[in-house]
A protein has these predicted regions:
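Alpha-helical transmembrane segments, especially those used as permease/efflux helices
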Residues: 14-19, 25-32, 36, 260-274, ...
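Juxtamembrane segments of multi-pass membrane proteins
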Residues: 465-472, 477-488, 493-720
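Small-residue-rich transmembrane alpha-helices
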Residues: 273, 317-320, 329, 353-385, ...
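Short cytosolic juxtamembrane segments of multi-pass membrane proteins
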Residues: 420-438, 940, 976-991
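Membrane transport/envelope proteins' first extracytoplasmic loop
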Residues: 2-313, 322, 376-384, 394-397, ...
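C-terminal transmembrane helical bundles of large multi-pass transporters
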Residues: 804-806, 829-922, 926-931, 939-945, ...
C-alpha cells in the first residue's frame, strides 16, 4: 500500500505540492488567530500602560508594599518581622505569575540624630533617616567621592552615601565622621561617614519608580544587609519601616489568563490589609479595564476571521472534489480489480495523513511569520517601520493548526466515500448519462442566501433607526456575528445565482453568433455551455467568493482608516492649529498670582452678568495686544496661514426664533404664586435666543487655502459658501439646527457675547458640517451646541479684539518636526498646538484599529493566495484531462495556435467573467454591509459620518494580485501544453 501511495504521489507531484501549499496556508491562517490575537492584546495593554506612565509619571508595572514595625520590640524581633514580611510579599508576587523586572527591598530608621551637631537655626539637632536598599549600587552614579563598603570598618565606622539634596536637607558633609543616636534613647551611639554623593543613573529606571528626591529627601543610604544585621544588633538603629517593591515587566506579560490575575490581585489587597501591610499596584485599574477592552478586541478579531474560515472550508472542499474527480477513474479501476472500499479509502487517508503531518509542522511557524509581518501594518496592505508585534509560539497555535488538518482530512475523505462505491462500468455509464441539477439548485439555495441576508440587513437597520430615535445606544451591535455571516452568505448567494444562469447565457451567445464564431471560439462556448454541472462552475464560484471577499475586506479596511483620518482632519480643520498668549495689563497683573492662559481669561469674561462688580465687568472689555501675525508666515514648511477666531456660549437671538426652553425640575419648584400673576412688561421685544452657540469667524479668502474638508459633507462646494461670506460681510452661516428654531434664509439675527454690544447679521446659508466645528459638541444643558460662521473683519469691527487661533497649511512633504523647531526659534510660545498628522498617527496606533487592519490584511493575503492556488489547480487538472480532446481537435485540422486561443477564450469566459462579477458583487456587498462596522467604534456620532468610499489604490492592489495570478497561470499552462506529446494525442484522436 505504501509503495502504491508514494508512486501515486510522485506521479501527481505538482498536484500534491499545490495541495500542500494550500493546506499550509489554511493551517497558517488558523494558527495566526491565537498568535495574532494574543500579540495584539499584549500591544494594546503595553500602549495603555505607557500612556498611563506618560500621563501620571508613575511606573505602571510597580508592585509596591510597605510595613510599619512596632517601636518597642528588640533587634532580633525586628529582623524576624522584616524577614516574615519579605517572605509574605515574595510568595504573593509569585502567585501572580507575572514576569519580574526587578526586586527591591528597603528598610529605614526615621528617628536618628547627629550628636553635637545643630542645624543652621542653632536650636535643634540634625535629624535624618538611615536607609538600606538592595542593589542600590547598580542603579546610581557617584558624582563625588566613592561608593560605600559593606560592613563596619576597622575604626568602627559605617560608610554611607547620600544625594546632594539630602545633604543640604540634613546639613551633613562628605568625608566627615558623625556620631549618631536614637532620638528616644541616646545612651548608645554608632559612627557613620558619608563617603560619596550620588545621583540616579537612569531617570527612566523602574528602580526609582516612586521617585528619589520626593521619597528619600533626608535619607542617608548604607548597605542593606549591614543595616539589617550589624546596625540593628547595636541597639542604636531600629527598623521603623520596611518596603518590598517589585517592578513587573509588563511588555512580557502573558495575556491568556488575565481574568484570574485580576481576581488574585483583588484577593491580595484584602490579604495585605488583614496583615497590616500597605499595598498598591498602579496598573490594577488598567488591567481591569483592559480585561473588558481585550474581550471586545478578541471578539472583533474572531468575527473578522469568520469569512476567511468559511473560505478556507470551501477551498478545502473544492480541492478535494477536484482531486477525486480527477482520480475517479483510477478509484473505479481499483474497485473492479478486487480492492475493498477500506483499502481504497486507506490509500487516500494515508495521503491526507502525510500532508496533514507536514502541515502541522510547517503551518504554525508560517503563521508566526505572517504575524510578524502584520505587526508593521499601518493600514490595509500598508506597512511601516514599526517595532514588530511581540509574537511567540503557543500551544493554542499548534492546536488550531491540528484542527485545520482534521477539517482538511475529513473534507478530503468525504468525496472519496461515494467514489469507492462505483465500479468501472458504473463510472463509464455515469459519464454518458445526463447530469441532474445539483441539490442547491433544486432547493434554490442562492435565493435563500441572498433573501435571508438582505432581510436581516433590513431588520438590523430598522432596529438601529428605532434605537437612535429613542436615544438608545445598541451595545449588542459590537458583538453581533451575524453581520459577518450575512455578508459572506450574500456573496455566496450571488455567486450561486451567477453560475445558475451563466450556462444559459453562454448557450444563447453561442446560438446568436454561431455563423460568425471562429472554430476556437465556438468550441470554447460549447464546452462551457455544456458544462452545466462541471468544474468550470465550481471555479467561477470559487473566484467569486475569493475576489469578492478581497474587495469586501479592502473596502472595510479603507472605510475604517478613512473614518479615522477624516475625523482627525475635520476636528483640527487644517494641518496645524496654534494659539499663543496675548498680553495686556490685566493679564500681566493676574499672572503674578495665578497664571492662566489668554483663552481662559477670555472665557471668564464671557461669564459675567450685570449683577457682578464693576471690576469684573472690565474683564469683558479688556484690550488685548495683537502679536505680529507675519511671524507665522515665515515658519518652516508653511504654505498658507490664516486667522480664525472661536468663541463658545455666544448668544444668537431673533424675533422669528422659537427655541425650546430647557426646563428643569428646579425651575418648577422655584415658581411662586406671584410668578404666575406677574404682569410686568417683557423688555425682550418678543425675541427668543440660544446661548449654546459655537462662533467661528474667518477670513474667507485665506480660509479656503488652509482648511481641510470633504466636499461630500455639503450640498455645494465649500468655496461657494466662502464666496458668499466674502461678498456680503454682515452675513452668517448657521448650523442646520437653527432651521428647527424657525429661521430662514435672509432672516436677520442678533449676536452678542461678553461685554460687547450686540450686532446684527443676515442668514446666508444653513449647513450640517463646517471645518473644525462639531455638531455633536455637548452644551451645558446636556444637548448639542449650535454653530455660526461669520466674516472675521466684520466681527472684528463690531467687537473688541480677542485672541484668535492661527491655522496653517503645510507644504507637501513638509516635516512637522522642522515646523515645531521653527516655532521655538521664532520665540513663539504656544499655549496649544495641534497637528493633524500627529493626531492621525496616534489614531492609527489605536490597538483596535491596528488589530483590525492586521486581521483584514491577513485575511486578504490568505484569500488571494488560496485564489491563486485554487485557480492553478483547476487549470492544471483541466489541461491534463483534455489531452484526448486536443488530439481530436488537431486531427480535425485545428492549428496549435487555435488550441491556445481556445484556452485563452475559456479563461476569459470563465475566469475573466467570474473576476469582473466578483468585483461588482464585492462592491455591492461593501456598500450594504461595511457601514455596520461603525457600531464597533461607536461611530454613530462621528464627524464626518461613517462612509464607504472605494479607493482606487485598493483596487489597483487587487488588480495587481489578480494580474499576477493570471500571468502565473498562463506561464504554467503554457509549459504544460508544450510538454503534452501532441503526436500521441494525435494518434489517440485518429483512433
Amino acid at each position: 500500500m505504501f509503495t502504491l501511495l508514494f508512486r501515486k504521489m510522485r506521479n501527481t507531484k505538482w498536484m500534491v505540492l499545490c495541495l500542500l501549499i494550500g493546506f499550509v496556508m489554511a493551517s497558517a491562517m488558523m494558527s495566526t488567530i491565537p498568535i495574532y490575537m494574543n500579540a495584539s492584546l499584549q500591544r494594546m495593554l503595553v500602549k495603555d500602560l505607557e500612556s498611563f506612565q506618560t500621563e501620571y509619571e508613575i511606573y505602571p508595572g510597580a508592585y509596591n508594599t510597605s510595613y510599619g514595625l512596632k517601636m518597642d520590640i528588640s533587634g532580633s524581633e525586628q529582623q524576624k518581622a522584616v524577614e516574615n514580611y519579605n517572605n509574605k510579599v515574595e510568595a504573593k508576587f509569585k502567585e501572580l505569575g507575572l514576569p519580574e523586572k526587578l526586586d527591591k527591598k528597603y528598610i529605614s530608621d526615621e528617628y536618628l540624630y547627629v550628636r553635637s551637631l545643630a542645624v543652621s537655626d542653632g536650636n535643634s539637632q540634625a535629624r535624618f533617616t538611615l536607609g538600606g536598599m538592595t542593589d542600590i549600587s547598580d542603579h546610581i552614579s557617584i558624582k563625588q567621592g566613592r561608593m560605600f563598603t559593606a560592613g563596619k570598618r576597622s575604626d568602627g565606622v559605617y560608610e554611607c552615601v547620600a544625594t546632594e539634596k539630602a545633604m543640604k536637607s540634613t546639613e551633613l558633609a562628605i568625608n566627615t565622621v558623625y556620631e549618631i543616636a536614637d532620638v528616644f534613647d541616646d545612651n548608645k551611639s554608632i559612627k557613620i561617614e558619608i563617603v560619596g554623593v550620588f545621583d540616579v543613573k537612569d531617570e527612566n529606571d523602574a528602580y526609582w519608580a516612586e521617585g528619589l528626591d520626593s521619597q528619600y529627601t533626608a535619607v542617608v543610604f548604607t548597605d542593606y544587609d549591614t543595616m539589617l544585621g550589624d546596625c540593628v544588633d547595636t541597639g542604636v538603629v531600629n527598623i521603623t519601616k520596611a518596603v518590598h517593591n517589585y517592578a513587573v515587566d509588563y511588555a512580557s506579560m502573558n495575556m491568556t489568563d488575565l481574568a484570574s490575575t485580576n481576581e488574585m490581585i483583588a484577593k491580595q489587597k484584602t490579604y495585605f490589609g488583614d496583615n497590616s501591610i500597605g499595598f498598591s499596584m498602579p496598573a490594577s485599574d488598567i488591567l481591569k479595564d483592559y480585561e473588558s477592552r481585550s474581550s471586545q478586541l478578541q471578539l472583533v478579531l474572531w468575527l473578522l476571521q469568520i469569512p476567511v474560515i468559511l473560505m478556507i472550508i470551501f477551498y478545502l472542499f473544492m480541492v478535494s472534489q477536484l482531486n477525486v474527480e480527477q482520480e475517479r477513474n483510477e478509484i473505479a479501476v481499483f474497485k473492479s480489480r478486487g480492492a475493498s472500499r477500506l483499502q481504497i479509502m486507506g490509500i487516500y487517508a494515508l495521503e491526507s495523513l502525510v500532508l496533514g503531518v507536514l502541515t502541522v509542522i510547517i503551518g504554525p511557524f508560517a503563521g508566526l511569520g505572517l504575524c510578524k509581518v502584520l505587526g508593521a501594518s499601518n493600514g490595509f496592505l500598508e506597512f511601516v517601520n514599526r517595532r514588530s508585534l511581540p509574537v511567540h509560539m503557543t500551544i493554542e497555535a499548534v492546536v488550531y493548526a491540528a484542527i485545520a488538518v482534521a477539517v482538511f482530512f475529513v473534507t478530503t475523505m468525504i468525496p472519496i466515500v461515494p467514489a469507492t462505491k462505483t465500479t468501472i462500468v458504473e463510472h463509464k455509464q455515469s459519464k454518458a448519462k445526463k447530469k441532474k441539477h445539483a441539490l442547491w439548485e433544486k432547493v434554490c439555495l442562492d435565493f435563500i442566501l441572498v433573501g435571508g441576508s438582505v432581510g436581516w440587513l433590513y431588520y438590523y437597520n430598522k432596529t438601529q433607526e428605532k434605537l437612535v430615535a429613542e436615544g438608545v445606544t445598541d451595545t449588542t451591535a459590537t458583538v453581533n456575528p451575524i453581520m459577518f455571516v450575512a455578508s459572506t452568505a450574500f456573496i455566496l448567494g450571488l455567486g450561486l445565482f451567477l453560475i445558475r444562469i451563466y450556462p444559459y447565457i453562454i448557450r444563447l451567445l453561442a446560438r446568436i453568433g454561431r455563423r460568425v464564431w471562429s472554430p476556437a471560439q465556438y468550441v470554447s462556448l460549447t464546452n462551457i455551455g455544456r458544462s452545466s454541472t462541471g468544474r468550470e462552475r465550481f471555479l467561477m464560484l470559487f473566484l467569486v467568493l475569493t475576489v469578492s471577499l478581497g474587495v469586501f475586506f479592502a473596502n472595510t479596511a479603507r472605510a475604517l482608516n478613512r473614518n479615522a483620518e477624516e475625523s482627525v482632519a475635520y476636528g483640527v480643520g487644517c494641518d496645524a492649529v496654534l494659539t499663543e498668549q496675548w498680553y495686556s495689563s490685566k493679564i500681566e497683573s493676574a499672572q503674578q498670582t495665578t497664571p492662566q492662559s489668554a483663552s481662559q481669561a477670555a472665557q471668564s469674561g464671557t461669564k459675567q452678568t450685570s449683577e457682578e462688580s464693576d471690576e469684573e465687568d472690565t474683564e469683558t472689555t479688556i484690550q488685548y495686544v495683537e502679536p505680529v501675525f507675519e511671524r507665522f508666515e515665515k515658519l518652516a514648511g508653511v504654505e498658507n496661514v490664516t486667522k480664525v477666531f472661536r468663541k463658545d456660549d455666544v448668544t444668537i437671538s431673533s424675533n422669528k426664533m422659537n427655541v425650546p426652553r430647557q426646563q428643569t425640575k428646579s425651575d418648577d419648584e422655584e415658581k411662586t404664586r406671584d410668578d404666575f400673576l406677574d404682569q410686568s412688561v417683557d423688555t425682550s421685544s418678543g425675541k427668543s435666543s440660544t446661548s449654546n452657540v459655537q462662533l467661528m469667524t474667518i477670513v474667507p479668502s485665506d480660509f479656503s487655502k488652509v482648511c481641510k474638508f470633504e466636499d461630500r459633507l455639503l450640498p455645494v462646494q465649500l468655496n461657494n459658501y466662502l464666496n458668499a461670506l466674502a461678498e456680503y460681510t454682515p452675513g452668517v452661516i448657521l448650523s442646520s439646527s437653527f432651521k428647527s428654531y424657525g429661521l430662514e434664509l435672509g432672516d436677520t439675527v442678533e449676536c452678542k457675547w461678553g461685554g460687547n454690544e450686540p450686532f446684527e447679521v443676515t442668514v446666508l446659508a444653513f449647513v450640517d458640517y463646517w471645518p473644525g466645528l462639531s455638531p455633536y459638541k455637548e452644551a451645558k444643558n446636556g444637548g448639542y451646541m449650535d454653530f455660526a460662521v461669520m466674516n472675521y473683519d466684520y466681527v472684528n469691527v463690531q467687537t473688541s479684539m480677542e485672541p484668535y487661533e492661527v491655522w496653517f497649511k503645510l507644504k507637501d512633504g513638509a516635516s512637522v518636526q522642522e515646523f515645531y523647531d521653527s516655532i521655538d526659534k521664532a520665540g513663539i510660545k504656544p499655549l496649544t498646538l495641534e497637528s493633524a498628522s500627529q493626531q492621525t498617527i496616534e489614531k492609527k496606533n489605536d490597538p483596535m484599529l491596528q488589530g483590525m487592519n492586521g486581521a483584514l490584511t491577513l485575511g486578504f493575503i490568505i484569500i488571494m493566495v488560496m485564489c491563486i492556488i485554487g485557480f492553478l489547480i483547476y487549470w492544471i487538472l483541466s489541461i491534463k484531462s483534455r489531452t484526448l480532446q486536443f488530439g481530436i481537435l488537431r486531427a480535425m485540422g485545428m492549428k496549435f495556435r487555435e488550441i491556445i486561443m481556445m484556452i485563452v477564450y475559456e479563461q476569459l469566459l470563465v475566469s475573466g467573467v467570474a473576476i469582473f462579477a466578483a468585483i461588482f458583487i464585492g462592491g455591492v456587498t461593501s456598500a450594504l454591509f461595511v457601514p455596520l462596522f461603525q457600531s464597533i467604534f461607536d461611530a454613530s456620532q462621528s464627524v464626518p459620518p461613517f462612509a464607504v468610499i472605494p479607493e482606487r489604490s485598493d483596487y489597483l492592489k487587487l488588480y495587481a494580485v489578480i494580474g499576477v495570478m493570471l500571468l502565473t497561470a498562463f506561464v504554467v499552462l503554457g509549459r504544460l501544453i508544450k510538454k503534452i506529446k501532441i503526436s500521441q494525442a494525435l494518434k489517440l484522436g485518429e483512433d
